[in-house]
Protein backbone atom coordinates (compact mmCIF):
# COMPACT_ATOMS: atom_id res chain seq x y z
CA UNK A 1 0.00 0.00 0.00
CA UNK A 2 3.00 2.30 0.43
CA UNK A 3 4.05 1.83 -3.20
CA UNK A 4 3.00 5.00 -5.09
CA UNK A 5 3.38 3.17 -8.39
CA UNK A 6 0.84 0.42 -7.62
CA UNK A 7 -1.34 -0.67 -10.53
CA UNK A 8 -4.76 0.52 -9.35
CA UNK A 9 -6.70 -1.46 -11.92
CA UNK A 10 -4.91 -4.68 -10.97
CA UNK A 11 -5.53 -3.94 -7.28
CA UNK A 12 -9.26 -3.58 -7.92
CA UNK A 13 -9.27 -7.05 -9.44
CA UNK A 14 -7.46 -8.64 -6.47
CA UNK A 15 -8.64 -6.85 -3.31
CA UNK A 16 -12.15 -7.98 -2.41
CA UNK A 17 -12.32 -10.37 -5.34
CA UNK A 18 -15.42 -12.56 -4.68
CA UNK A 19 -13.72 -15.69 -6.00
CA UNK A 20 -10.70 -15.19 -3.74
CA UNK A 21 -12.95 -14.43 -0.76
CA UNK A 22 -14.91 -17.64 -1.32
CA UNK A 23 -11.68 -19.63 -1.51
CA UNK A 24 -10.60 -18.10 1.78
CA UNK A 25 -13.93 -18.93 3.38
CA UNK A 26 -13.66 -22.54 2.22
CA UNK A 27 -10.28 -22.82 3.91
CA UNK A 28 -11.73 -21.43 7.13
CA UNK A 29 -14.43 -24.11 7.05
CA UNK A 30 -11.80 -26.79 6.53
CA UNK A 31 -9.68 -25.55 9.47
CA UNK A 32 -12.22 -26.04 12.29
CA UNK A 33 -11.86 -29.21 14.39
CA UNK A 34 -14.72 -30.98 16.15
CA UNK A 35 -13.16 -32.69 19.17
CA UNK A 36 -16.37 -33.71 20.94
CA UNK A 37 -19.87 -34.55 19.79
CA UNK A 38 -21.61 -36.41 22.59
CA UNK A 39 -24.65 -38.42 21.48
CA UNK A 40 -24.30 -36.87 18.00
CA UNK A 41 -25.63 -33.54 19.22
CA UNK A 42 -24.34 -31.80 16.10
CA UNK A 43 -25.54 -30.84 13.64
CA UNK A 44 -28.56 -28.88 14.84
CA UNK A 45 -30.31 -28.58 11.48
CA UNK A 46 -33.72 -27.35 12.65
CA UNK A 47 -34.38 -23.68 13.27
CA UNK A 48 -34.27 -23.61 17.07
CA UNK A 49 -33.85 -21.03 19.80
CA UNK A 50 -30.20 -20.65 20.72
CA UNK A 51 -28.65 -18.82 23.65
CA UNK A 52 -25.25 -17.28 22.85
CA UNK A 53 -24.09 -15.22 25.85
CA UNK A 54 -21.98 -12.13 25.39
CA UNK A 55 -18.27 -12.65 25.92
CA UNK A 56 -16.04 -10.42 28.01
CA UNK A 57 -12.51 -9.97 26.69
CA UNK A 58 -10.71 -8.61 29.76
CA UNK A 59 -8.11 -5.87 29.79
CA UNK A 60 -4.62 -7.25 29.39
CA UNK A 61 -1.22 -7.00 27.73
CA UNK A 62 -0.54 -8.04 24.15
CA UNK A 63 2.60 -9.86 23.03
CA UNK A 64 4.28 -6.46 22.75
CA UNK A 65 3.01 -5.54 26.25
CA UNK A 66 0.59 -2.92 25.05
CA UNK A 67 -2.54 -2.93 27.21
CA UNK A 68 -5.79 -3.61 25.36
CA UNK A 69 -8.98 -2.32 27.02
CA UNK A 70 -11.79 -4.58 28.21
CA UNK A 71 -14.39 -5.41 25.58
CA UNK A 72 -17.83 -6.99 25.89
CA UNK A 73 -19.30 -8.22 22.63
CA UNK A 74 -21.69 -10.61 20.88
CA UNK A 75 -19.61 -13.47 19.43
CA UNK A 76 -22.12 -13.92 16.60
CA UNK A 77 -23.63 -10.72 15.14
CA UNK A 78 -27.43 -10.76 14.96
CA UNK A 79 -27.48 -10.38 11.18
CA UNK A 80 -25.47 -13.62 10.95
CA UNK A 81 -27.34 -15.55 13.64
CA UNK A 82 -30.77 -14.85 12.16
CA UNK A 83 -29.83 -16.85 9.05
CA UNK A 84 -29.63 -20.00 11.16
CA UNK A 85 -31.55 -19.78 14.45
CA UNK A 86 -33.81 -17.64 16.60
CA UNK A 87 -32.03 -15.75 19.34
CA UNK A 88 -32.88 -16.62 22.95
CA UNK A 89 -32.29 -13.86 25.49
CA UNK A 90 -31.53 -16.31 28.29
CA UNK A 91 -31.03 -19.98 28.99
CA UNK A 92 -34.63 -20.49 30.13
CA UNK A 93 -35.97 -19.78 26.64
CA UNK A 94 -33.31 -21.69 24.71
CA UNK A 95 -33.28 -25.11 23.11
CA UNK A 96 -29.50 -25.17 23.23
CA UNK A 97 -26.59 -22.84 23.99
CA UNK A 98 -23.35 -21.96 22.22
CA UNK A 99 -20.60 -20.54 24.42
CA UNK A 100 -17.61 -18.84 22.81
CA UNK A 101 -14.38 -18.85 24.82
CA UNK A 102 -10.69 -18.34 24.08
CA UNK A 103 -7.86 -20.62 25.11
CA UNK A 104 -6.08 -19.49 28.30
CA UNK A 105 -3.88 -16.38 28.05
CA UNK A 106 -1.14 -16.18 30.68
CA UNK A 107 -0.55 -12.76 32.19
CA UNK A 108 2.81 -11.42 30.93
CA UNK A 109 3.31 -14.58 28.85
CA UNK A 110 6.30 -16.05 30.63
CA UNK A 111 8.20 -13.03 31.92
CA UNK A 112 7.36 -10.57 34.67
CA UNK A 113 9.47 -7.47 35.26
CA UNK A 114 9.46 -8.13 39.04
CA UNK A 115 9.34 -11.93 39.22
CA UNK A 116 11.53 -12.70 36.21
CA UNK A 117 10.65 -15.89 34.33
CA UNK A 118 7.21 -17.27 35.22
CA UNK A 119 5.20 -20.21 33.87
CA UNK A 120 3.04 -19.96 30.77
CA UNK A 121 -0.18 -21.64 31.79
CA UNK A 122 -2.47 -23.61 29.49
CA UNK A 123 -5.27 -23.77 32.06
CA UNK A 124 -7.74 -21.18 33.37
CA UNK A 125 -7.13 -21.68 37.09
CA UNK A 126 -3.97 -20.23 38.64
CA UNK A 127 -1.04 -22.58 38.10
CA UNK A 128 1.97 -22.98 40.39
CA UNK A 129 4.87 -24.81 38.77
CA UNK A 130 5.75 -27.23 41.57
CA UNK A 131 7.04 -29.92 39.18
CA UNK A 132 9.03 -27.70 36.79
CA UNK A 133 12.74 -28.38 36.39
CA UNK A 134 14.93 -26.75 39.03
CA UNK A 135 17.55 -25.60 36.56
CA UNK A 136 17.00 -24.43 33.00
CA UNK A 137 20.11 -23.94 30.90
CA UNK A 138 18.41 -21.74 28.31
CA UNK A 139 19.40 -18.27 29.41
CA UNK A 140 16.88 -16.45 27.25
CA UNK A 141 16.82 -12.65 27.40
CA UNK A 142 20.34 -11.16 27.03
CA UNK A 143 19.37 -8.46 29.53
CA UNK A 144 18.72 -11.12 32.19
CA UNK A 145 21.64 -11.55 34.61
CA UNK A 146 20.85 -15.11 35.68
CA UNK A 147 21.87 -18.10 33.56
CA UNK A 148 19.00 -20.11 35.07
CA UNK A 149 15.55 -19.30 33.74
CA UNK A 150 13.70 -21.89 35.83
CA UNK A 151 10.27 -20.81 37.11
CA UNK A 152 9.86 -23.65 39.61
CA UNK A 153 7.58 -22.63 42.48
CA UNK A 154 6.24 -19.54 40.71
CA UNK A 155 2.58 -18.96 39.84
CA UNK A 156 0.97 -18.02 36.54
CA UNK A 157 -2.33 -16.15 36.39
CA UNK A 158 -4.67 -16.44 33.41
CA UNK A 159 -6.11 -13.18 32.11
CA UNK A 160 -9.29 -14.72 30.72
CA UNK A 161 -10.27 -17.01 33.59
CA UNK A 162 -13.68 -15.36 33.16
CA UNK A 163 -14.19 -17.59 30.11
CA UNK A 164 -14.32 -20.64 32.37
CA UNK A 165 -16.64 -18.80 34.76
CA UNK A 166 -18.96 -17.99 31.85
CA UNK A 167 -19.09 -21.61 30.73
CA UNK A 168 -19.76 -22.82 34.27
CA UNK A 169 -22.62 -20.35 34.62
CA UNK A 170 -24.24 -21.29 31.32
CA UNK A 171 -23.87 -25.00 32.05
CA UNK A 172 -25.72 -24.51 35.34
CA UNK A 173 -28.43 -22.35 33.77
CA UNK A 174 -29.03 -24.78 30.90
CA UNK A 175 -29.45 -27.79 33.17
CA UNK A 176 -29.87 -30.88 30.99
CA UNK A 177 -30.22 -28.88 27.77
CA UNK A 178 -27.23 -29.12 25.41
CA UNK A 179 -24.25 -26.76 25.51
CA UNK A 180 -21.91 -26.34 22.54
CA UNK A 181 -18.50 -24.81 23.22
CA UNK A 182 -16.58 -22.91 20.56
CA UNK A 183 -12.95 -22.78 21.68
CA UNK A 184 -11.04 -20.08 19.81
CA UNK A 185 -7.57 -21.51 20.23
CA UNK A 186 -4.21 -19.78 20.15
CA UNK A 187 -2.43 -22.19 22.52
CA UNK A 188 -2.87 -25.89 23.32
CA UNK A 189 -5.39 -26.10 26.16
CA UNK A 190 -5.76 -28.31 29.24
CA UNK A 191 -9.26 -29.55 28.49
CA UNK A 192 -10.18 -31.10 31.83
CA UNK A 193 -11.61 -27.79 33.06
CA UNK A 194 -14.03 -27.33 30.17
CA UNK A 195 -14.68 -30.67 28.45
CA UNK A 196 -16.98 -32.10 31.17
CA UNK A 197 -19.17 -28.98 30.86
CA UNK A 198 -19.73 -29.32 27.10
CA UNK A 199 -21.85 -31.64 24.99
CA UNK A 200 -19.98 -30.68 21.83
CA UNK A 201 -16.75 -28.75 21.23
CA UNK A 202 -15.51 -27.01 18.10
CA UNK A 203 -11.95 -25.69 17.98
CA UNK A 204 -11.19 -22.81 15.63
CA UNK A 205 -8.15 -20.76 14.77
CA UNK A 206 -9.11 -17.13 14.11
CA UNK A 207 -12.06 -17.78 11.80
CA UNK A 208 -15.20 -15.70 11.38
CA UNK A 209 -18.42 -16.38 13.29
CA UNK A 210 -20.38 -17.53 10.23
CA UNK A 211 -18.02 -20.48 9.85
CA UNK A 212 -19.10 -21.88 13.21
CA UNK A 213 -22.76 -21.35 12.37
CA UNK A 214 -22.38 -23.23 9.09
CA UNK A 215 -20.83 -26.16 10.96
CA UNK A 216 -23.21 -26.19 13.93
CA UNK A 217 -26.25 -26.05 11.64
CA UNK A 218 -24.99 -28.82 9.38
CA UNK A 219 -24.73 -26.73 6.24
CA UNK A 220 -21.12 -27.85 6.20
CA UNK A 221 -19.31 -30.67 7.99
CA UNK A 222 -16.16 -30.20 10.10
CA UNK A 223 -13.20 -32.12 8.69
CA UNK A 224 -9.97 -30.79 10.22
CA UNK A 225 -7.56 -32.49 12.61
CA UNK A 226 -5.77 -30.86 15.52
CA UNK A 227 -2.34 -29.43 14.66
CA UNK A 228 -1.23 -29.84 18.30
CA UNK A 229 -1.68 -32.29 21.16
CA UNK A 230 -3.92 -31.28 24.06
CA UNK A 231 -2.19 -32.08 27.37
CA UNK A 232 -3.80 -33.98 30.22
CA UNK A 233 -2.53 -31.45 32.76
CA UNK A 234 0.12 -28.82 33.34
CA UNK A 235 2.17 -31.50 35.08
CA UNK A 236 2.14 -33.43 31.80
CA UNK A 237 3.41 -30.29 30.06
CA UNK A 238 6.30 -29.95 32.51
CA UNK A 239 7.43 -33.56 32.26
CA UNK A 240 7.40 -34.03 28.49
CA UNK A 241 10.44 -33.56 26.25
CA UNK A 242 10.03 -30.36 24.25
CA UNK A 243 12.19 -31.63 21.39
CA UNK A 244 10.40 -34.99 21.00
CA UNK A 245 7.20 -35.14 18.91
CA UNK A 246 4.03 -36.75 20.30
CA UNK A 247 5.67 -37.12 23.69
CA UNK A 248 2.94 -35.67 25.90
CA UNK A 249 0.23 -37.37 27.95
CA UNK A 250 -2.94 -36.26 26.19
CA UNK A 251 -6.34 -35.58 27.67
CA UNK A 252 -9.01 -38.26 27.21
CA UNK A 253 -12.61 -37.09 27.24
CA UNK A 254 -15.63 -38.79 28.79
CA UNK A 255 -16.53 -40.49 25.50
Regions found by a protein language model. Give the residues of each.
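Long, well-ordered, tryptophan-enriched scaffold segments
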Residues: 1-4, 9
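C-terminal non-catalytic regions of proteins with extracellular/luminal or membrane-system context
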Residues: 8-9, 14-255
Amino acid sequence: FENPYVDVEHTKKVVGNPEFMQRGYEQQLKSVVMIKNHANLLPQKERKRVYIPQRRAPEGPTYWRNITPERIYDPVPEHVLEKYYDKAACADNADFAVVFIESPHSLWMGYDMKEGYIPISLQYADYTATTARKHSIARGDPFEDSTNRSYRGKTAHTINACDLTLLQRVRKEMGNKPVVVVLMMSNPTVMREIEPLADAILVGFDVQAQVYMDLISGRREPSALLPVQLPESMEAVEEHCEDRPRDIRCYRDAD
